[in-house]
Amino acid sequence: MEVLIERLSKLGYLRSDLVEKRGDFAVRGGILDLFPPDQEHPIRIDFFAKKLTPFK
């Protein structure tokens, strides 16, 4: 997870407590919330469930 966090930061994403705008990401345990700049809604990656979930 640390490698992914470092990579996202290098790509210009900003770590925050709450993902509210494009370019934000947040980490809580094995869950990564990410708002890609080219998407209308953020996504959630649950590394324990091994699935990608869009959320609004």
Locations of regions flagged by a protein language model:
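ASCE RecA-like P-loop NTPase motor cores
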Residues: 1-56
